[in-house]
Amino acid sequence: MGYWNSKVVPKFKKLFEKNSAKKAAAAEATKTFDESKETINKEIEEKKTELQPKVVETYEATSAEVKALVRDPKVAGLKKNSAAVQKYLEELVKIEFPGSKAVSEASSSFGAGYVAGPVTFIFEKVSVFLPEEVKTKEIPVEEVKAEEPAKTEEPAKTEGTSGEKEEIVEETKKGETPETAVVEEKKPEVEEKKEEATPAPAVVETPVKEPETTTTAPVAEPPKP
C-alpha cells in the first residue's frame, strides 16, 4: 500500500495534469483558430482556381483511411489515424492551403484528436475541391443469401427439362424401331405383290405350219353344142 501511494499515485497525477494541460492548450488553440475562420474562407475563395489541381493531387496521393476522413471526418478516426492525418496536413501546408499551417502545428503539438474541430474544418474545405465520389450500391448480405437458393434452383429445372427431353428422345427412338421393323417386313410383301402383278412371261408355242397344198380349181369345160 505504501508503494502504491508513493510511486504509482504520483505518476497518475502527473499524467492527468499533463492531459488536462494538453486539453487546455488544445482548447485555446481551437478558440484562436475559430476566430480566423472568416479570413480563411476569404483566402480559399480568392485562390479557388489555383488550389483546385493541387488539392486533387495531394488527395489522390494520400492513403485510403485519410481519404475517407477528408470526406467524412470523425473524432475516433482522427485519433486512430493521427500520424497519417498529420502527414496529410503537412502536404496541405506545402501547397499553401489557407489555415492548414495553424492546424498542422496544433495537431503536431496536441494530436489530431484534441484539435478535431480545426482539422474537420480544413477537411470540409478540402472536400469542396474534390470530384463527387461515385457510390456503388451495396447489396445487403441477407438479400444475397436469399438470391443464392433461387439461382441454384434454375439449373435443377434445366436438368429436369433435359431429362424429360432425353426420355422423349428415348421414347421416340424406341417408337421408331417398330416402324422400321414394319417397313422392313413390308418390303417382302411389296416384292411379292410386284411378282404377282407382273407374272412370268408364258412360253408361246408357235404352231408349225403344214406345207400348203395348192389345189388347182377344175377347169370348166365349154358347153357342149
From Swiss-Prot:
Induction remarks: Accumulates in response to CuCl(2), mannitol, sorbitol, and flagellin oligopeptide (e.g. flg22) treatments. Induced after long treatment (2 days) with NaCl, KCl, MgCl(2) and FeCl(3). Slight induction in Mg(2+) deprivation. Slightly repressed by dehydration.
Modified residues (Phosphoserine): S107
Main location: membrane
GO biological process: cellular response to copper ion; cellular response to iron ion; cellular response to magnesium ion; cellular response to magnesium starvation; cellular response to mannitol stimulus; cellular response to molecule of bacterial origin; cellular response to potassium ion; cellular response to salt stress
Disruption phenotype: Long etiolated hypocotyls. Reduced accumulation and cell-to-cell movement of Turnip mosaic virus (TuMV) leading to an enhanced plant resistance.
Manner of cofactor binding, per the entry note: Binds 6 Cu(2+) ions per subunit. Decreased of the heat stability in the presence of metal ions (e.g. K(+), Ca(2+), Cu(2+), Sr(2+) and Mg(2+)).
Covalent lipidation (N-myristoyl glycine), chain numbering: G2
Modified positions (Phosphothreonine) in chain numbering: T32, T152, T177
Keywords for this protein: Calcium, Calmodulin-binding, Cell junction, Cell membrane, Copper, Cytoplasm, Cytoskeleton, Host-virus interaction, Lipid-binding, Lipoprotein, Membrane, Microtubule, Myristate, Phosphoprotein
One Pfam family this sequence matches: DREPP
Required cofactor names: Cu(2+)
Effect of G2A: No N-myristoylation leading to cytoplasmic location, but normal interaction with Turnip mosaic virus (TuMV) P3N-PIPO
GO cellular component terms given for this protein: cytoplasmic microtubule; cytosol; host cell; plant-type vacuole; plasma membrane; plasmodesma
Basic and acidic residues bias (residue ranges): 140-197
Membrane topology: Lipid-anchor
Tissue: Mostly expressed in the basal region of hypocotyls. Expressed in seedlings, roots, shoots, stems, leaves (e.g. in epidermis and vascular tissues), flowers (e.g. in pistils and anthers) and siliques (at protein level).
PANTHER family: PLASMA MEMBRANE-ASSOCIATED CATION-BINDING PROTEIN 1
Subunit record text: Interacts with Turnip mosaic virus (TuMV) P3N-PIPO.
Function: May be involved in intracellular signaling through interaction with PtdInsPs and calmodulin (CaM); may keep PtdInsPs attached to the plasma membrane until Ca(2+)-CaM reaches a competitive concentration subsequent to an increase triggered by a stimulus, thus leading to PtdInsPs release and subsequent activation of InsPs-dependent signaling cascade. Interacts competitively at the N-terminus with calcium ions and CaM (in a calcium-dependent manner), and with the phosphatidylinositol phosphates PtdIns(3,4,5)P(3), PtdIns(3,4)P(2), PtdIns(4,5)P(2) and PtdIns(3,5)P(2).
Family per similarity comment: Belongs to the DREPP family.
The protein's name: Plasma membrane-associated cation-binding protein 1
Lineage of the organism: Eukaryota, Viridiplantae, Streptophyta, Embryophyta, Tracheophyta
Name of the gene encoding the protein in the UniProt record: PCAP1
